[in-house]
């Protein structure tokens, strides 16, 4: 009997448990619709809480001084995961509801409905749990202050991860204060140090400031101090005039109060930190120094006992890098190409620079014959002894692959500049034209188009590097420059063909055995005070003497034996006040740059230079006159910007006589602008114009400035003028235009014009890119609605190509434009100071296409609080882009 009772109790318990399970399981199915509705409601509540928290974070983080708490980020990340699961459930809910039968009490597939219903309940509990956790008193904390400028870096990096971790970990060790990285050129030292710099920008490391300095060969204390001073905000006219000891003291006084990291790229000798003003890093101050160099010996001199060698890539990583550069399409274009590509990779000896350059060169070679030719050419690299001789022929292959001798000559020409020198593209193309690499017979515009095409080819071939911030400059990698000089000298056989001793501190002419063999000579950036002698340079075509700040005198005999000289650059020689009359003997001269010199008059002999095409006289602030310039019958470009000599009626008459003139940059007073209507050739040629009134000559100013709609005008600056209105008129030489139009005007600067109330004339500049308006006390509108209606037959939408708008000290400014504008290209809106009445910006929720790249910079905290946004959507779109400067 007792046994029966025991069995009965056991069965009852199991039946009870089964019935409970059945009840719960049944609820998964029977209550599915209600559970889904509860889940949707709970998810809506959770999303609302998330949006509230995210909004708080955005408002607190946009200044850059705070960062979100880790626990808040975990909560937000978990919501994202939950939301994905919720969307997954929701995507099949209709099918699951239709699977139910018997009024929802059963299912056509009980197992499937049970599993789905259980997922709904489990997710509902998680959502409710997350919702209850989403109550935060604070959502951000003070961000660690680490001033780091993130540097651009190539997209394809292979084989450096382990070395990056090794260097970073070493740098973070308490007992390590200086880290030295050494290795051959082109091996990736700069890339590695750049990654270290950028890692600081992401992780901080507890440092106040990270300073990046490119040192290079023959660097001076002044150059290094200037780079550090710029980062610390010390630069300026007064600071530049101090001696190195005073600058060192200033640097030291700033850095001794900071925990800093100093990154020195490409040092060739010991850098005396004390002389520069940098406190020596130690355990006490917690500061760090890291540097790259070609020499292990330099590491020892810098006090590094265990420097890290950056070696070439191993075979596997080298092959991976070449594959990425060549691309799968090219490698797959013929079954034999991968095998030949491996041979090419082996010939590069693991040098990243060679792999990058040759990989990009071969990326469009898709025939087996081209790859066979590549392996044949690269085989000759083994015929040279020494590392340099193994590298340069490899690099030369990309040079050999350039189409045409003109492109090759243009590339080699870039090696005349110092290491790491940023060369302005426009200046470089003018050099190329005068050298004859580019023909100008069909006009300046076509010649420049060809020049930019060549530059694009050289950049894409990795033979030139385009500026990271300034796209108008290019530079050369050190090893590529060495290769170019090697080619210039006929692979080292005739080194005197090209003398390049730029930026090495010369104070007298170099010793050259055979001056008659010299074709190009670059002595720029040196310490000449006088240039004496009469070298017999009968083959000399190019002579660079610019940036010799101490140069006072050039002897009369110096230019006597240079009959072939076509390019002479004497710019930025600030102590040079006169030129010898013997310059008239440079009968082949086509390019003369005297910009930034202190010359007071042009030598009479200059008038004899009948082949002169380009004359640059910008920033010649003591130059009294250029009368007689009409004798230069071949002149095409005249640059006079910021010169003491301005465009007056007499000069206009002379320039009108120059039949080949195509480009002028000049200053002019507002009262003389109207004279341009009388001199059509001069008007057509003006590309940069600087309109300035002289306080001592008020009779030259006007109340209404009438601008001729100059088609070629690219840049206009109106500074300290007294006019109260600017009007546009069609020019006599463009009468066929319906409306006056500045079709090429891209840059406008207006400063200190207190009488102006609006700039409505900008409606006639449809291709404007940069607009800067400063210190116009009575300016009320950029574009006036009333005036626009009076001058236009139909509405024109302004600023469609505007990229940067800079406004400063405009106390009466109320409006930029009366309606919201699309601003398809706008990247930066600067409201720098004292624009208190500008409350409404021409923005709505659809303005600015790439809002993620857009920034609104402002200097007064109260200003952003007074902004009247179009609506909440507009505020939500643009408030995170605002940055307090």
Swiss-Prot record:
Keywords: ATP-binding, Coiled coil, Leucine-rich repeat, Nucleotide-binding, Plant defense, Repeat. Pfam families: LRR_14, NB-ARC, WH_DRP. Changing residue 342 to C: In strain: cv. Cvi-0, cv. Kas-0, cv. Landsberg erecta and cv. Mt-0. Changing residue 289 to I: In strain: cv. Cvi-0, cv. Kas-0, cv. Landsberg erecta and cv. Mt-0. Belongs to the disease resistance NB-LRR family. In contrast to RPS5, which is absent in cv. Landsberg erecta, RFL1 in present in both cv. Columbia and cv. Landsberg erecta. This is Disease resistance protein RFL1. It comes from Arabidopsis thaliana.
């Amino acid at each position: 009997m007792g046994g029966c009772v025991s069995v009965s109790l056991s069965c009852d318990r199991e039946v009870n448990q089964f019935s409970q399970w059945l009840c719960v399981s049944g609820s998964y199915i029977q209550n599915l619709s209600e559970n889904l509705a509860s889940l949707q409601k709970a998810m809506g509540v959770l999303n609302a809480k998330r949006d509230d928290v995210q909004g708080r974070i955005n408002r607190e983080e946009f200044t850059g001084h705070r960062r979100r708490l880790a626990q808040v980020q975990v909560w937000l990340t978990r919501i994202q995961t939950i939301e994905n699961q919720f969307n997954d459930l929701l995507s099949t809910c209709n099918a699951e509801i239709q699977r139910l039968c018997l009024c929802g009490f059963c299912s056509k597939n009980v197992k499937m409905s049970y599993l789905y219903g259980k997922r709904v309940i489990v997710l509902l509990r998680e959502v409710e749990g997350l919702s209850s956790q989403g109550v935060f008193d604070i959502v951000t904390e003070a961000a660690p202050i680490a001033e780091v400028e993130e540097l651009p870096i190539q997209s394809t990096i292979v084989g450096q991860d382990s070395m990056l971790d090794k260097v970073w970990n070493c740098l973070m060790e308490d007992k390590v204060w200086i880290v030295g990285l050494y290795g051959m050129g082109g091996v990736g030292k700069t890339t590695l140090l750049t990654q270290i710099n950028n890692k600081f920008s992401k992780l901080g490391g507890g440092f106040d400031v990270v300073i990046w300095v490119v040192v290079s060969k023959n660097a001076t204390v002044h150059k290094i101090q200037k780079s550090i001073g710029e980062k610390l905000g010390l630069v300026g006219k007064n600071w530049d005039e101090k001696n190195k000891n005073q600058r060192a003291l200033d640097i030291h006084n700033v850095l001794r109060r900071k925990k800093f990291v100093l990154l020195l790229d490409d040092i060739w000798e010991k850098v005396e930190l004390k002389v520069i003003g940098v406190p020596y890093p130690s355990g006490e101050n917690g500061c760090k120094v890291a540097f790259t160099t070609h020499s292990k010996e330099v590491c020892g001199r810098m006090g590094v006992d265990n420097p890290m060698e950056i070696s070439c890539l191993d075979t596997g990583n080298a092959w991976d890098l070449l594959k990425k550069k060549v691309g799968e399409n090219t490698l797959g274009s013929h079954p034999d190409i991968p095998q030949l590509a491996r041979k090419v990779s082996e010939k590069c000896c693991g040098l990243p620079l060679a792999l990058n350059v040759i990989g990009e060169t071969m990326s469009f070679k898709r025939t087996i014959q081209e790859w066979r030719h590549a392996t044949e050419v690269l085989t000759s690299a083994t015929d040279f002894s020494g590392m340099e001789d193994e590298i340069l022929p490899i690099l030369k292959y990309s040079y050999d692959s350039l189409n045409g001798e003109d492109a090759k000559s243009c590339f080699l020409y870039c090696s005349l500049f110092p290491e790491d020198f940023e060369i302005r593209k426009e200046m470089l193309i003018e050099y190329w034209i005068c050298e004859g690499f580019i023909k100008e017979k069909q006009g300046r515009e076509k010649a420049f188009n060809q020049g930019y095409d060549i530059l694009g080819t050289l950049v894409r071939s990795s033979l030139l590097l385009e500026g990271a911030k300034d796209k108008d400059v290019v530079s050369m990698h050190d090893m590529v420059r060495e290769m170019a000089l090697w080619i210039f000298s006929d692979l080292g056989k005739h080194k005197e063909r090209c003398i390049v001793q730029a930026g090495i501190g010369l104070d007298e002419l170099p010793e050259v055995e055979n001056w008659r063999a010299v074709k190009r000579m670059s002595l720029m950036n040196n310490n000449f005070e006088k240039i004496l002698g009469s070298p017999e340079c009968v083959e000399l075509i190019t002579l660079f003497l610019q940036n010799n700040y101490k140069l006072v005198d050039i002897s009369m005999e110096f230019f006597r034996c240079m009959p072939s000289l076509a390019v002479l650059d004497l710019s930025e020689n600030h102590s040079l006040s006169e030129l010898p009359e013997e310059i008239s003997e440079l009968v082949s001269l086509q390019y003369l740059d005297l910009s930034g010199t202190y010359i007071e008059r042009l030598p009479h002999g200059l008038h004899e230079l009948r082949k002169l095409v380009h004359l640059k006289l910008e920033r010649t602030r003591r130059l009294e006159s250029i009368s007689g310039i009409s004798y230069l019958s071949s002149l095409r470009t005249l640059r006079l910007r910021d010169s003491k000599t301005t465009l007056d009626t007499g000069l206009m008459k002379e320039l009108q006589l120059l039949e080949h003139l195509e480009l002028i940059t000049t200053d002019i007073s507002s009262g003389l602008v109207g004279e341009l209507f009388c001199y059509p050739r001069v008007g057509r040629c003006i590309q940069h114009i600087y309109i300035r009134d002289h306080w001592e000559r008020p009779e030259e100013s006007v109340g209404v400035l009438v601008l001729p709609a100059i088609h070629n005008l690219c840049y206009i600056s109106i500074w300290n003028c007294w006019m109260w209105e600017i009007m546009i008129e069609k020019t006599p030489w463009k009468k066929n235009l319906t409306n006056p139009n500045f079709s090429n005007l891209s840059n406008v600067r207006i400063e200190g014009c207190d009488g102006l109330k609006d700039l409505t004339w900008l409606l006639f500049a449809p291709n404007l890119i940069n607009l800067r308006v400063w210190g116009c006390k009575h300016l009320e509108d950029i574009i006036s609605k009333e005036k626009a209606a009076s001058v236009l037959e139909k509405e024109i939408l302004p600023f469609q190509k505007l990229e940067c708008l800079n406004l400063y000290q405009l106390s009466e400014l109320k409006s930029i434009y009366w309606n919201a504008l699309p601003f398809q290209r706008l990247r930066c809106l600067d409201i720098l100071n004292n624009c208190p009445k500008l409350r409404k910006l021409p923005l709505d929720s659809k303005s600015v296409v790439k809002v993620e790249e857009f920034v609104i910079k402002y200097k007064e905290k109260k200003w952003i609080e007074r902004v009247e946004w179009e609506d909440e959507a507009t505020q939500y779109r643009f408030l995170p882009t605002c940055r307090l400067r």
